Each structure stands twice: as C-alpha cells, then as structure tokens.
C-alpha cells in the first residue's frame, strides 16, 4: 500500500508566497490556538496576509487551549491547564500555563498512542516531542511555537503580524475568523472556504472519517 503524507494531503505545500483562494480575503484575522484544526491551516495557507490577535480575551472551551485528536475510542480532547486569570478580561497573551497534573506527559502519550501506527509518525515525532518536555510560562508562546513548526512542515510562509492592541473595528475587506473557527461553530458554514477532504485515518474503519482534526 502506498500511503500519502497526511500533511501534504490535508494542506498542499506551497513554495514562497501565500496563496489566495476560495474564502480567502485580503487580510485574515485569527486567534492563537493549541495545535489548531485543519481548517485553521487551510486559512493560513490561502490568506495573502495574516494578523494574529493577541489582545483578545481568553475564552474557555475554545481551541485556545484545546485540541482534538482521533483516539482509539473516538475524538479525544486534550486541554492545556491554565492558571486562574486575574480578571475575566485577561488577554490571551497574558494567560499562564498551570504546571500541574503532568499534562505534558499525558498529552504526548495520547499523541503517541493515537498516531504511532500511522505511516509518517516516526518522521515527525522528533519535531513535536520537544514541546512536551519544555516548560512554557505563557499559553500564547506555546501555541505560537507549535504553529510556526507546523507552518514550516507544511511550507506555509511563517510571518504574521501581531496586533498591537485589540482590533475592535475590523477594517473593510478583512476576514475576521477569531471566533469563527470554534468547537461550537458548524464546520460546514463555508465562511472560511474550508471543505474537508478524505485522507487516511488509523481508526477510520471503526469510527468513520473524523473531520477537521488537530494534527
């Protein structure tokens, strides 16, 4: 059996410039997510310019500290524990990771258990494993370093513009996806121009195809 590299299947590699396609706007506004879902990288791939919102208020039950992978028993959510924010309006950039519960070890073991039998896991594991042995004080820094790694592996140009302050009024022609890519939002709204394509998944025969995973 000849396997396709899932990273190339899900988001085709590009060379030097961001590519504008269906659903992409002149400038895209995103939030920082933990191992963001495929839809997120689809937007990054197609957007000519990306601004990363770092002054948005941290929100629970979002992808800011949670990713979803395909486990043996179905979708598995992995959440990075955070310290209690000093106020209900604490900015994402100021959210601190709580070092309790041995979460790094648990997350890495879950990733290995879920993907160790996939054709390309050994090829990529050395890139990702160090993130689960290093201490990051801030959630945003952890998320962004992982995003930079995934962008490099996918061949997506890495530079983004970090917002100097919260963008309350979105400029004309911009696409605001800060709250669009969210576990509570319907995937097939078409707002981001992302439509899932089938690719190899380890547990597909048991669970069916799981869309928009974080891997």
Predicted features and spans:
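Residues lining hydrophobic/aromatic ligand-binding pockets adjacent to catalytic sites
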Residues: 3-4, 14-215
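N-terminal amphipathic/hydrophobic targeting modules at extreme N-termini
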Residues: 9-11
């Amino acid at each position: 059996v000849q396997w396709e590299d899932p990273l190339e299947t899900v988001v085709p590699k590009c060379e030097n410039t961001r590519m504008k396609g269906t659903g992409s706007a002149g400038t895209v506004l995103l939030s920082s997510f933990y191992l963001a879902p495929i839809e997120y990288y689809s937007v990054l791939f197609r957007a000519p310019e990306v601004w990363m919102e770092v002054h948005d208020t941290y929100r629970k039950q979002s992808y800011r500290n949670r990713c979803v992978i395909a486990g043996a028993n179905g979708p598995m959510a992995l959440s990075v524990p955070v310290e209690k924010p000093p106020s209900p309006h604490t900015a994402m950039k100021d959210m601190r990771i709580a070092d309790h519960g041995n979460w790094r070890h648990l997350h890495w073991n879950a990733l290995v258990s879920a993907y160790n039998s996939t054709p390309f896991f050994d090829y990529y594991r050395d890139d990702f494993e160090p993130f689960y042995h290093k201490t990051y004080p801030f959630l945003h820094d952890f998320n962004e370093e992982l995003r930079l790694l995934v962008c490099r592996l996918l061949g997506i140009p890495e530079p983004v513009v970090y917002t100097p302050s919260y963008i309350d009024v979105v400029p004309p022609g911009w696409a605001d996806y800060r709250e669009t890519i969210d576990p509570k939002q319907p995937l097939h709204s078409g707002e981001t121009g992302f439509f899932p394509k089938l690719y190899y998944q380890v547990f597909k025969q048991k669970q069916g195809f799981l869309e928009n995973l974080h891997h």
